Regions:
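Bacterial N-terminal signal peptides that target proteins for export
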Residues: 1-5
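N-terminal secretory-pathway/extracellular module detecting exported/lumenal segments
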Residues: 20-163
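N-terminal signal peptide c-region/cleavage motif recognized by signal peptidases
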Residues: 14-16
Length: 163
């Protein structure tokens, strides 16, 4: 009887956060802060063009924010990822402006905080170009993941451009 009451009490008190599966294989977790973590799933990555230097993919993502209150859907995002061992980049439109982010996986002039804040870009790039596991690993060991895939990027720090 007490076992049944304990199970019932647990079931009735379970929050939406407990009911969700935070270990879903298709999710890639990016930046985590005090209010939770950014996550995404790849809905589409369509090859647009391949050259000697790399491959351009048109991407569509489903984005989320996970916290103690549960996982909130943040909608879909479209963009482009240029998979290149020498010029890795991400492009997207935000508020009517085109934004480009050039990755510097071996940055020598970038603070640890800056690298941490760019975790979403790193996760997205490596997940599209090398698979979800590489994206997940890049959040915690960007240089190691880039090195394991033969990257040789000369940028001393990551760069963002808006037009």
């Amino acid at each position: 009887m007490t076992r049944t009451l304990a199970a019932l009490a647990l079931a009735l008190s379970a929050s939406p956060a407990l009911a969700q599966d935070y270990n879903r294989q298709e999710l890639v977790r990016g930046l985590c802060q005090k209010d939770g973590c950014d996550e995404f799933t790849i809905l589409a990555a369509d090859r647009v063009k391949t050259t000697e230097e790399g491959t351009l993919f048109k991407t569509r993502l489903s984005t989320f924010h996970a916290s103690h209150a549960g996982r909130q859907d943040r909608g879909e995002e479209n963009g482009y990822v240029y998979c290149s061992p020498t010029r890795p980049a991400i492009m997207a439109e935000q508020n009517g402006q085109t934004m480009a982010f050039f990755l510097a996986p071996f940055a020598t002039q970038e603070s640890r905080e800056s690298v941490r804040k760019n975790a979403n870009f790193h996760a997205l790039y490596f997940a599209i170009c090398h698979g979800r596991e590489a994206g997940k690993a890049a959040v915690h060991n960007l240089a190691g993941v880039a090195q394991s895939h033969g990257y040789r990027v000369a940028l001393a720090q990551s760069t963002s451009l808006c037009r």
